[in-house]
Regions:
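Terminal intrinsically disordered, low-complexity extensions flanking WD-repeat/beta-propeller proteins
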Residues: 175, 204-289
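Short C-terminal beta-strands that terminate individual repeats in beta-propeller domains
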Residues: 23-42, 79-85, 93, 103-106, ...
Length: 289
């Protein structure tokens, strides 16, 4: 398990060890706790996002307030690559679930980037109307992803169409802090917001239909996620520091949804940089004005 903190380091913990006193290893951070002396390849500020590669289990991606994304080899505890194409803090980094070399990032510079780690300067850049809070790949469309914003909107993009989002809808009053796609039923989404609600949505081609909602009594809700092994379970947490587990089968609109066979994502996906993307954020920003 990888844990990011307000420090420029990543803790790696073994879930097989009960009551462990310290992590198995630490990626980056200070050299022997010396002030102002960082390990080679370390982030310089807080770690905001983490993502394990599903194909190469020793590879971890991290995003930071220092505006960089780093790829780590956990076995050697070293940084393999640093990506620095964003211009502001990066709260989101996500490996693609099928194409192991593809990364999704979202930054406070109001840009989402889909890049290939083998050629990180060539990618697809998509502008956002507000700062991002969360993002995740669309399990129903291997070329798509969802991104939530500080203005309470949820947007769905297709990297083959860079002119406009496929879907854009207001889902919360205040920031929409988290979005999760159900892996067994990819058209089922969950969102969480600082308004204290967790909401369930059924995704259509161009709009979302609300299937249910719950005030989970957690204060401002900062995260929600479906449990992959038990896709009817949804976890959420917030400022109350408590954890809420919701069995969404109790929602009338979802009756029978989990009785259907789980859908599978495509085995192979080919990503190419969009025709109007040069790989330079300054150029992309000029085109957005």
């Amino acid at each position: 398990m990888a844990v990011g903190t307000f420090r420029p380091e990543i803790e790696i913990w073994s879930t097989d060890v009960i009551d462990a006193m310290e992590p198995d290893c630490v990626l980056g951070g200070l050299v022997d706790n010396k002030k102002r002396t960082l390990k080679p390849g370390s982030h310089r500020q807080a770690v905001m996002g983490l993502s394990w590669n599903r194909e190469y289990r020793n590879v971890l991606a991290s995003s930071s307030a220092d505006t960089t994304v780093k790829l780590w080899d956990v076995t050697t505890q070293k940084c393999m690559m640093t990506l620095n194409f964003h211009k502001d803090k990066i709260p989101v980094v996500q490996f693609h679930p099928v194409e192991a070399n593809v990364l999704l990032t979202a930054s406070y510079d109001r840009v989402c980037a889909v890049t290939d780690g083998r050629s990180p300067n060539n990618g697809t850049w998509l502008g956002l109307p507000a700062k991002p809070e969360s993002a995740t790949w669309d399990a129903a469309n291997p070329y798509g992803f969802y991104c939530s914003t500080e203005e309470g909107e949820l947007l769905c993009f297709d990297v083959r169409r860079t002119d406009a989002p496929v879907l854009r809808q207001k889902v919360h009053e205040g920031p929409c802090t988290s979005v999760s796609v159900n892996q067994a039923n990819p058209r089922l989404l969950a969102t969480a917001g600082e308004d204290g609600f967790v909401r369930l949505w059924e995704a259509g081609e161009t709009a979302l239909r609300q299937a249910g909602e719950r005030n989970v009594n957690l204060g401002n809700v900062f995260a929600c996620s479906f449990y992959e092994s038990q896709p009817h379970l949804l976890a959420a947490c917030g400022t109350s520091q408590d954890l809420c587990l919701w069995d969404v089968r109790e929602v009338e609109a979802l009756a029978g949804v989990f009785d259907q066979p789980a859908q599978e994502m495509a085995e192979k996906v080919v990503f190419e940089a969009s025709e109007n993307a040069t790989g330079t954020l300054n150029d992309i920003k000029k085109k957005r004005k």
